[in-house]
Amino acid sequence: RGSILIDGMPTAGKKTYQVNRMGVARTFQNIRLFKELSVIDNIKVGLHESLRYDLASSLLRLPNYWKEEKKCTERALELLDIFHMADFANVPAGSLPYGAQRRLEIMRALATSPKLLLLDEPAAGMNPSETAELTETIRRIRDDFNIAVLLIEHDMSLVMGICEGIAVLNFGRIIAKGTPDEIRNNPQVIEAYLGK
């Protein structure tokens, strides 16, 4: 039991969009892209909260609408460029390889400009090459974007390779907290994962 605070504000009872406005974005274990939409349009979905035009501007295609849409497209292209996916901007998201779809989902979450990025088993179903690319993506988010990343993951090499602090759960109970070296040498962790 406990509570989650973002900048001192409780998240309990908040709707998803309210938590997002507090600066939290997340991805899910199962990829949730708009597979028929282009890669760039998937990222633009994450930017919708930042658009500053009203319904009339949108319906009538007034100048403010075009100005905001241009900014949105530029930001989406910037993210694609940063993560080396600009060549896929107009490709349907569903046609991307699995690892690229996962990175796209993370980029869409980043488009919301979060303070905290929650990643739920991002390496699930990935091959070693895709996991290596994902590791670099997460490291870059942490270092270059200065965003806190909360990672839920079973791939221990990924966790040990990028996390500064680790909490290990066994059947829903925290059995250890510490640095990668502390966790690697913790007898309770070794017993839980390798058995006696």
Spans of features found by a protein language model:
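Glycine-rich phosphate-binding loops of nucleotide-dependent enzymes
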Residues: R1-K196
